[in-house]
Amino acid sequence: MLSASVLTSAAILENNRFIYNSCSIEFLLLVYLLVRKARKKIRFIIGVVLSVLILAVLGTGSLYIYKTVSALDTITGVNKDVTKINVYVKEDDPAQKLADASGYTFGILSELDRDNTDQALQQMYYELGSDVQTNEYSGLSELADSLNNGTTGAIILNQAYLDVLDEMDNYSSFSSQLREIASLQVETVVQRKTPQVTEATGSTTETSDNSSADAAVTDEVYTIYVSGIDTRGEMTASSRSDVNIILTVNTRTKQILMISTPRDYFVPLSISNGVPDKLTHAGIYGVNVSMDTLNMLYDININYYFRLNFAGFEKIIDALGGITVNSDYEFDSQNTKGYHFNKGENHLNGEQALVFTRERYAFKEGDRQRGRDQMAVIQGVVDKATQPAFLKNYLSVMDSLDGCFETNVPYDIIASLVRRQLDEGGSWQVLSYSADGTGDTQKPYSMSQKAYVMIPDQTTVDKAKTLMKKVREGFMLSEADVAR
């Protein structure tokens, strides 16, 4: 998503290898002819200079290609989600490892995330060589209380739930009183719906499988989910998703529409049997649940996803030499003191951009405005990466990608799209729109008590549906179409 410029070398590697090698051979032949019978000093000097020049060019080109391919191999083609189910004891408990707690009674959630818990229990059985004694609890607060009052000696819990507990009244310090004695990983295959062109007109259908798409297919419309996490943990680990953006990408009209959905949107999850939850909590159960939940909300089929780590995203921005971001308001940051942002253009380094994307308390519209600012930062990165000056920062940007984002978009699809861009040229139009709602206090599916949520404004949801449909069908939108 960092633009075609970031991926240009990969496309050159696949599409222009012949030209690259042919030019190299011709250049070497020229050097040979100049030096072969170097009776004249000037001809010999020219030959030597050209030899040094071609070595430098070939070395630099090879380095650019290597860095690009290496980066793409790292971030593309991801097909699994990892859920970490951890075993926790109180900080002062004598148990240091799982075997030390073999005689304990373990607290577990009776329904929430039960499939992952059961798989973790099976792993514990194989490791301990005996059955695990458990007590079941209906909610997070009951589970936490069981450990605090000694009813259980340890608890088995998806680590992503610790952030949820931190949000709950009377449990904000609970996670700091725990010690992890075992970590069990449960892997889930990430499903994707691959667009397939059915006619020359570019109309598409979806197939739900994990096969690689034909690299020659470029006349497609992609619907891509961008999940933004704010953590320094592993990218593949399931966690709450604080950024939820849907990209509708029409490669024929060169138009990209970004739809932001607030993290606190109170909607049924695909696994909650109709019980509403905060959208951010969908990420606890894996990226499949986040995508399926948004599919239900907007009546769409998401093809692929990008998972973006905003805590590491600052590395990319610093590698780019900073970005220019348009702010709707002049404000001082509240979460992190000491940062001031002007209305209009702001040139930001990585740390400043991270503060900008995190801020919500400085705005009357809170999380709504934060979603718009997150899209503005993504737009700033795209704008900077498509400028010619980007090439001087290219290698440092490639080095910064690892650990910042991942995607299940296959390598060949990205290379195919880049080759088309190189062949046809032309600029892309990027527009954004945010779904809205009304603040309320409700009990979410994943929590044991009431919390702040946002009740969806169906009018804005319907408008988002219409906008995405128009982009998919090839209509060119204007700024007026996405105005709030």
Describe each model-derived feature in a short phrase.
Residues 59-77:
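Hydrophobic alpha-helical transmembrane segments in integral membrane proteins
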Residues 76-80, 88-91, 97, 105-112, ...:
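Non-catalytic, solvent-exposed segments at the cell envelope interface
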Residues 43-64:
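Internal/C-terminal transmembrane anchor helices
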Residues 1-35:
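Membrane-embedded alpha-helical segments of integral membrane proteins
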Residues 36-40, 67-70:
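Juxtamembrane transmembrane-helix termini
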Residues 34, 38, 44-47:
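N-terminal secretory targeting and juxtamembrane "stalk" segments of secreted and cell-surface proteins
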